[in-house]
Amino acid sequence: VKSLPSPRLAGAALLALLAPLAAQAEALNPPVKVRYEEVVRSILYVPKYVALSQGYFKDAGLDVSMKTSQGTDKGMTALLSGSADIVLIGPEASIYVQNSESPVKPRIFAGLTATDGFFLLARKPVEKFDWSMLKGKEVIGFRPGSNPLVFLETALRKHGVDPQKDVKLLNNIGIPARAGAWMAGQGEYGIFLEPEAGELVRNGKGYIVASVGHEVGQVDYTVFTATDKYIRDNPKVIQAWTDVVARAEKYVQDTPAATLTPQIMTYFPGMDQAAVTEAIERYKKYQIWKRSPLVTAEAMTQLQDMLVASAVMKDSARAKYEDVVVADFARKAQ
């Protein structure tokens, strides 16, 4: 006669059977539609594309529609006007709005990138690059007050180069026109995201000489943001979104670039798979992606130090961490 399983083993078996059901039960039902806008289309946001293509959002009961804002300023406008529910933008925008008279206040609830994903390109090969080489040169930067420019200026100052006096920063070129301006001969150096950076290199139009984020260090660069009202009214949506981000970040950290590439190709039609893999490997090398969605107080303090140093914000205008970031969702998702 076969012995009956012990109560402990029977209980463990029951839990194993119920686990998938519990995971499904946690999904929002019926699914919730979320209007989402990304700041730009870039390989910098691989964890998000993986989450979309691999059904992470669907698993969580989120029906996501996506648009591309073409700039943090435009993404914030969409959020404040109510045409987007959640946006992926630079954290500096939430600090600016916190100090404004806007009755609608944005709150950061999850982080995606651990630092700046821009690469500094030179027109000619440089055997041993030094940031002092930028002195007296024309450099394609970014929109004044934007995170890309603030991070670039921080890297310059770190290496003894005054961004206001020692270099000529070209900051008036629209996002869609930047690569074209470089190809047309503007700038002796310039900062570019992937996939543009890699495309310029492969076409012999530029040479990567530095990672801006690597020079600056780990300071949150792009974050998921919603209005305080949306977060109050939809805490389950925000928690589900943050859980998805945490899941995607862990997966990207643990997965080879060659495996990730086919999972995101639908968002980069026409691109060569080998080129996408190379771009992902480059971002992995510099530890650009966060391991956890939590945006810390230390990171926000450092960012505000940078904003003050770049003279885009007065020291007296610093925002309190808890006024800009709601960390509860990220802490629960870890």
Predicted regions and their residues:
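Pocket-lining segment of extracytoplasmic ligand-binding domains
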Residues: 93, 124, 176-268
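Bacterial N-terminal signal peptides
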Residues: 11-20
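Bacterial N-terminal signal peptides that target proteins for export
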Residues: 1-11
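Sec/Tat signal peptide C-region and signal peptidase I cleavage site
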Residues: 21-25
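Predominant activation on well-ordered alpha-helical scaffold segments within soluble catalytic domains
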Residues: 49, 95, 153, 198, ...
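Short, glycine-/small- and polar/acidic-enriched structural segments
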Residues: 26-164, 168-174, 181, 188-194, ...
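Secondary-structure end/capping motifs
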Residues: 232-314
